[in-house]
Amino acid sequence: MNLDEAIQFMTNEIVLILSCNKPTIYLYGSVVLDDFKLGWSDIDILVLTESEITEEQASKLVNLRQNMLERYPGNPYFRLFEGGMLSAEAFINNKTERTVYWGTGGQRITDSYKVDSLGMAELLDSGVLLHGDDIRDKMIYPLYAQMRDDIARHVQAARKHGVVVGWLLDIARGIYTLRTGKIIAKTAAGEWALENNLCPDADAMQKTIQCRKEAHFMKEKSIDNSIIQRFADVIDAEFANTAERFAQSELQRMNIAYDTLSLIRNKDGVSVWRVNSDNGSVVMKCFDKQEYRREIANYQLLKSLGVPTLEFIAHTDCSFIMEDIEHSKYRLATEKDTSDPNTAIKIARWYKTLHQNGRDYANTHPMFDECDTITAENINKIKEKTGTDGLPVWTLIEDNLDKICSAAIRLPRTLNYNDFYYTNLVVARDDSSALVFDYNLLGKGYVYSDIRNVCCSLGSDDARKAFLTEYGNYDESEKLVDDVVNWACGRFFGLSYDADLRLRL
């Protein structure tokens, strides 16, 4: 029995079990891309039914691969079938219901099945209908942003678990998709990477391609993880190199017409763009990393609470558009502004609004809190990274850690900005107001934490005095707790960027 016959036999068996449930069966992946290699590849299928699969149908389907092998001993294909079986409605709308899953590690009856964005693109671009009505017109083509997210997750898995040559092909295909937005067969991706000199270990990639082409004969597929790491470094750089394609796709999602797109900054997975059109210019911020996308929700939160922000124009789940400060009623602050008492007064008014309007929200919603970083584990990290284990201060802190944490947690909470610096500050051109932007570190905390943060960055005693006078009363007992809490938190966060922290301990 050859591959095509095995696919037909399996299709017939599935249809027989689901005959009263109008099954639609798709084949996609390496078989359709003419890249199936026995000993390496799977046979990817998707089975969608008119209504939820019954318990009886599920019990027959879940072990069908094994049953087919019993009927056709020695068949090399039946164990390679993988995929999900569920109703079309549940699959398309991502609902939970009785689902049959076949995977490399086994099979089970579960409650959902989802194809990642790369698999969905394969299904919609090149999938073959084996049986039933074609319903792909009801499915949504994955976004380029979704593909980037899935590729990033796959690269992290490669870094952690990559000890076989196949990971090199996965990374090569990821680079191809980042550059083109399209899916390519794994073997072709490896060859493309070689032709374009993308893999730092060309010999390893050549071996990988040979292994895939002769998978049935070449049993040795192991590889040193350091080779995977080096190629993963290449694709990490590719995320930055393809940031413009990402930005263009996000503008398309938001239906924003534009003439030119110019890069302002691209750092650590966050790219900032000036978008020019006949109607003027706006600024767009795109986030490759999930953890930084919280800024989108933070803008919306502040707006809902009546806290002044730059105009928030449009957004997706991974980018947003705001007014361009160069053509705004605001101007970017300079370091000189931090010494101006009049500017300090405007800053104090913004912070007072943030703290007053944010108190109820902070006390009823889970949010990032710097005090949560004060743990024995993090203190040990500080000591280890700074080589300061013998300092008496650590013994004092560790002996009183519960008291310190308890005192910090008892302080009243409100919203905290946490990141004041003049580069995050804008001042109204008519000097009527000032506000801060960049809300990635917005969280909850006690009032004095923000007051101390601002006062440390103001450039003169007069500015600090003006800020404190305008802000008004606050609980000065918070300062006593903050003297300890800020010391510990500051050193923990400093580890991420300050190699000379030990010199100041």
Residue ranges and their predicted role:
Residues V115, E122-A240:
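Conserved nucleotidyltransferase catalytic core and NTase-mimicking acidic/glycine-rich helix/loop elements
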Residues L415, A428-L468, E476:
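Active-site Asp-x-Gly
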